[in-house]
């Protein structure tokens, strides 16, 4: 589906093959869109007393998530090109950089962030007028990135990220899963659910990010096994059948 709807052609290095997302984003997004459609249907039924069909396809979902690249093509037949190191199609610098040990991301989405980065790095070459605006930096992107590469390779990623954070410049590490779940922020959000599974033993998984009102994630239980609740469901069905029909039902 990612190939059919153009996602893969937009993803990957310019000189590499088309690339799919590391996650099954079309499937996940289809579920999210379906939940929104169902909620809209339930809300409408509560107001009007009428049910409705929810017509949803993964193809439509994937097309809708093309967002601005789709608008650019449909309006002006401008096709977004792939850019090296996951860089932004128009903002510079906004991409991956290699430190002495690991990769990290810097994203200067506003001029103030570029100015802070330029001042932090202190390299006279960055003060050239050819780098003074979004347009000029994009025009001279290759030269600018070459300078930044020369600078960033001299320190470890964690050193750079500490300095960038102090100056409030948008940036972040490229984490593996161990680093993701060792992070204090992930722990503080209580997103990990641990439980005893009847056949698999102790299992941990990530919870839903939906946390509204008086919801309490501690009360969440595991998914049932196949046919685990059959008797319970049948008993509820029998109770429902035996109850007299109420008006308006």
List each language-model region with its residue ranges.
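Active-site-adjacent "lid/gating" segments in soluble enzymes
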Residues: 1-104, 108-109
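A glycine-rich dinucleotide-binding beta-alpha-beta segment and adjacent secondary-structure elements
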Residues: 166-218
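Flexible, small-/acidic-enriched active-site or ligand-binding loops
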Residues: 132, 200-238
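Aromatic-enriched alpha-helical interface/lid elements that frame and gate functional surfaces
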Residues: 92-167, 171
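Beta-rich nucleic-acid/ligand-interaction surfaces
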Residues: 62, 140, 179-183
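Single conserved hydrophobic/aromatic residue that forms the stacking wall/gate
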Residues: 239-249
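Short Gly/Pro-enriched turn/cap motifs at secondary-structure boundaries
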Residues: 84-89, 94-95, 139, 200-203, ...
């Amino acid at each position: 589906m990612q190939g059919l709807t153009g996602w893969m052609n937009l993803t990957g290095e310019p000189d590499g093959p088309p690339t799919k997302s590391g996650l099954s984003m079309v499937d996940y997004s289809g579920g999210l869109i379906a939940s929104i459609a169902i909620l809209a249907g339930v809300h409408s039924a509560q107001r009007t007393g009428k049910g409705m069909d929810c017509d949803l396809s993964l193809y439509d979902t994937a097309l809708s998530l093309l967002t601005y690249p789709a608008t650019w093509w449909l309006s002006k037949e401008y096709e977004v090109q792939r850019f090296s190191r996951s860089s932004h199609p128009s903002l510079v610098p906004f991409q991956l950089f290699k430190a002495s040990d690991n990769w990290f991301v810097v994203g200067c989405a506003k001029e103030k962030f570029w100015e802070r980065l330029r001042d932090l790095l202190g390299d006279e070459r960055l003060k050239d007028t050819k780098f003074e605006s979004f347009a000029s930096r994009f025009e001279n992107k290759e030269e600018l990135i070459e300078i930044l590469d020369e600078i960033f390779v001299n320190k470890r990623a964690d050193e750079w990220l500490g300095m960038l954070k102090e100056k409030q410049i948008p940036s972040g590490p490229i984490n593996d899963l161990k680093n993701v779940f060792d992070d204090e922020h992930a722990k503080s959000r209580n997103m990990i659910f641990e439980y005893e599974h009847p056949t698999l033993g102790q299992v941990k998984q990530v919870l839903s990010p939906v946390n509204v009102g008086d919801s309490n994630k501690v009360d969440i239980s595991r998914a049932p096994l196949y046919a685990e609740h059959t008797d319970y469901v049948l008993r509820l069905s029998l109770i429902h059948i035996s109850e007299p029909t109420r008006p308006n039902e």
